[in-house]
């Protein structure tokens, strides 16, 4: 299984903080957002490689971060913009950066096209754990992988969201008693359930042809949830109910809130 990190956006809502620096590498305390996530995912036996799909502007910064946090050599003379993280886990699985060639927010490919680009560039023909690297998570992805193995289908995550206003800004799924996905809507004005879908997915090898041809068959390009919505309509999918919470870092306010709550 490949872990594919979607990190090609330009995080314009964070202003100057991410004008020349990728949001996934912003630190919450001693660790970056991405570092916290990979510390967990790297421990999953099924994962054999991490793939970071990013843009041309930020690709060198990710490469520098990987070198700083995987080399066993002294890092004291490295560029101070990306430093070795304290208590760093030396990742056991290789990390590959894929550069999508874009340099501005206006020319971005969109999350779905970025995933397809990485799949084509690396000739990925394996199960994929696809994640957005702008969340702090309070559970292990191992639980999600185990759930997908048990169901034998591609899977999404879900969590109960009581706020109608928040449901109107995200993907919402209808489920049966076995957590099989019956339907999915993106940003519905009238949500049909309280099950919200965060940007974490498992696409199994048997469904990769559907993924590869999704955009040419009408799938939206911009948000990773567009692909999940498309896949729900074309194959059997199940939804894993998150066993604990997450913290979405989508703005300057939420970034500083994350530092205050979790960066000590």
Predicted features and spans:
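Conserved donor-nucleotide/metal-binding helix-loop-beta segment in metal-dependent transferases, i.e.
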Residues: 139-167
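Short alpha-helical oligomerization interface
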Residues: 19-23
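A structural signal for short hydrophobic beta-strand segments in well-ordered beta-sheet cores
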Residues: 25, 173-175, 239
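Alpha-helical elements of Rossmann-like donor-binding domains used by nucleotide-donor carbohydrate transfer enzymes
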Residues: 61, 113-117, 143, 226-227, ...
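Conserved catalytic core of nucleotide-sugar-dependent glycosyltransferases
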Residues: 165-181
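Catalytic-core segments of class I nucleotidyltransferases/pyrophosphorylases
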Residues: 145-146, 180-248, 252-264
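The conserved acidic donor/metal-binding loop of glycosyltransferases
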Residues: 133-136
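Conserved N-terminal catalytic core of the sugar/cofactor nucleotidyltransferase
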Residues: 2-5, 13, 27, 31-130
């Amino acid at each position: 299984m490949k872990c594919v990190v979607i990190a090609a956006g330009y995080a314009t809502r964070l202003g100057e903080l991410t004008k020349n620096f990728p949001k996934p590498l912003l630190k919450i305390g001693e660790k970056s957002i991405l570092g916290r996530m990979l510390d967990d995912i790297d421990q999953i036996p099924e994962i054999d490689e991490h793939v970071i799909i990013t843009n041309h502007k930020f690709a060198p910064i990710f490469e520098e971060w990987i070198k700083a946090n995987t080399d066993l050599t002294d890092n004291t003379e490295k560029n101070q913009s990306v430093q070795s993280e304290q208590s760093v886990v030396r990742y056991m699985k290789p990390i590959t950066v894929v550069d999508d060639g874009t340099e501005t927010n206006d020319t971005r490919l969109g999350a779905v096209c970025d995933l397809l680009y990485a799949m084509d560039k690396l000739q990925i023909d394996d199960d994929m754990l696809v994640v957005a690297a702008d969340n702090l998570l309070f559970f292990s992805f191992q639980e999600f992988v185990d759930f997908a193995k048990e169901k034998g289908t591609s899977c999404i995550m879900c969590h109960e969201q009581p706020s109608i206003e928040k449901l109107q800004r995200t993907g919402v799924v209808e489920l049966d008693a076995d957590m099989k996905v019956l339907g999915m809507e993106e940003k519905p004005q009238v949500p049909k359930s309280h099950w919200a879908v965060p940007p974490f997915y498992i696409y199994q090898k048997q469904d990769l042809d559907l993924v590869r041809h999704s955009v040419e068959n009408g799938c939206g390009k911009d948000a990773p949830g567009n692909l999940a919505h498309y896949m729900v309509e074309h194959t059997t999918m199940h939804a894993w109910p998150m066993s604990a919470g997450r913290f979405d870092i989508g703005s300057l306010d939420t970034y500083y809130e994350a530092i205050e709550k979790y960066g000590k």
